[in-house]
């Protein structure tokens, strides 16, 4: 039987069953039938079913580990610039609870099995497990699952981890352009993950390349270019067409057309893909715009763009937001770009920032290349004069220590041990 989880319709279904049974000469009480209906839907009682349905327009808790919700609260606090306490209250309210304590109590009950899993929770688990058969059964029974939202406003499509599950959800009516609380769509995920097959699937389903997430200008293309991805970008358009995009795409003509124009620094409200990166406020300072573009060219290994941007005034030692050009080139294994930047004046031992506030402060490029396991970049940096025994200012580690922290102890054959 297919159920539309609408309270009015559920009440009608219960009353219709009562009428049918009484017409057949059976004894039937509305309360008993409501309980029966609730049990069929996986709930212990009619009041629990009623409470669930009343909250369907809100975000549904679907994870049973409290740490997950703590992490989401931290993200809200970071993005909105509010206290953790305020972020927790906000998160609880999004789920229909009056306080953080109430949300924690509910999640704890889910964890202990005192709250039976709702249809959305069961569907989420099927998505996580890649169980297309089970998900199909749930969608057959509860077609409205495709429009329900979980924590952070993520729907089932947004949480789908493989193409089969994503395809099934699209077939059942999931909106390819529906974003979560931050505007993040599945096409943004394709850009972020450098996933061509997912991008093709979403584009074929009508996915738009011009939608922004986490700030104006945060298009799917920009999510890819933030990390220096190259394989997926030809599918994702060119929006928002500013200098960072031109640099990441390695388009010299576009760079020349943009430098010195307002469009060069336009649509740069987006600057981080998640709250793990610290807050920053991009400005319209032409020098900052140039310097940032050089970083984005280095991320993607666009050597012609690197040389052009330096010629136009970009600084090779600039650290506009969490990383110099050399840092990002090294982390991404862009060996030719590492050599190009040093030839243009970059200091291989410059101390810079990187990643989140607890990741890199006062750290040289070779340490980050070591953590990322980029052997060829490490060899190039050593050849160019990088000192692997410098200790970073935040953790006091050498390049070999960073390699081991990144599970790349095999790099001990090229990095000296300070002991």
Predicted regions and their residues:
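Ankyrin repeat A-helix N-terminal signature
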Residues: 125-130, 159-163, 189-195, 223-229, ...
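Intrinsically disordered, low-complexity eukaryotic regions enriched in glycine, serine
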Residues: 1-137, 141-142
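Ankyrin-repeat-protein effector appendages
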Residues: 111-122, 222-265, 269, 288-289, ...
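Conserved ankyrin/ankyrin-like repeat signature
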Residues: 134, 164-165, 197-198, 231-232, ...
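Repeat-mediated protein-protein interaction surfaces in helical alpha-solenoids
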Residues: 136-142, 222-230, 265-281
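Ankyrin-repeat boundary/"N-cap" motif
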Residues: 116-125, 147-161, 179-186, 212-219, ...
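Ankyrin repeat domain, specifically the short helix-to-loop turn at the C-terminus of the second helix
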Residues: 139-144, 167-175, 201-208, 235-240, ...
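Ankyrin-repeat and related helical/solenoid repeat scaffolds used for protein-protein interactions
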Residues: 194-197, 203, 210, 357-398
């Amino acid at each position: 039987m297919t159920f539309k989880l609408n309270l009015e319709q559920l009440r009608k279904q219960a009353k219709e069953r009562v009428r049918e049974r009484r017409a057949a000469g059976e004894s039937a009480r509305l309360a008993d039938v409501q309980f029966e209906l609730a049990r069929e839907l996986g709930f212990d009682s009619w009041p629990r079913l009623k409470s669930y349905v009343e909250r369907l327009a809100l975000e549904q808790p679907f994870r049973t580990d409290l740490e997950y919700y703590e992490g989401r609260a931290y993200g809200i606090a970071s993005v909105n610039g509010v206290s953790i306490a305020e972020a927790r209250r906000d998160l609880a309210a999004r789920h229909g609870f009056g306080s953080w304590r109430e949300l924690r109590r509910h999640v704890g009950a889910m964890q202990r099995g005192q709250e039976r899993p709702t249809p959305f929770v069961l569907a989420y688990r099927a998505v996580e497990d890649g169980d297309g058969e089970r998900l199909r059964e749930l969608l057959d029974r509860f077609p409205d699952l495709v429009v329900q939202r979980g924590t952070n406003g993520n729907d089932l499509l947004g949480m789908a981890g493989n193409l089969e599950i994503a395809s099934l959800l699209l077939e059942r009516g999931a909106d390819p352009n529906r974003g979560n609380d931050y505007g993040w769509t599945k096409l943004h995920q394709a850009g972020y993950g450098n996933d061509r097959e997912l991008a093709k699937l979403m584009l074929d389903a009508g996915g738009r390349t011009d939608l922004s997430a986490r700030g104006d200008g945060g298009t799917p293309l920009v999510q890819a270019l933030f990390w220096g991805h190259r394989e997926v970008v030809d599918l994702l358009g060119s929006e928002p067409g500013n200098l960072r995009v031109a640099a990441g795409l390695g388009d010299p003509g576009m760079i020349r057309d943009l430098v010195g124009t307002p469009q060069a620094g336009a649509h740069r409200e987006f600057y981080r893909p998640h709250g793990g990166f610290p807050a920053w406020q991009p400005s319209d300072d032409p020098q900052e715009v140039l310097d940032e573009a050089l970083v984005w060219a280095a991320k993607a290994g666009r050597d012609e763009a690197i040389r052009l941007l330096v010629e136009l005034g970009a600084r090779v030692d600039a650290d506009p937001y969490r990383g110099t050009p050399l840092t990002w080139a090294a982390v991404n294994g862009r060996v030719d770009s590492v050599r190009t930047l040093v030839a243009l004046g970059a200091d291989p031992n410059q101390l810079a920032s990187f990643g989140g506030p607890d990741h890199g402060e006062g750290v040289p490029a070779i340490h980050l290349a070591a953590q990322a396991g980029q052997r060829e970049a490490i060899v190039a940096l050593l050849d160019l004069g990088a000192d692997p025994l410098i200790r970073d200012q935040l953790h006091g580690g050498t390049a070999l220590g960073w390699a081991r922290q990144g599970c790349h102890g095999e790099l001990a054959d090229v990095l000296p041990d300070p002991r």
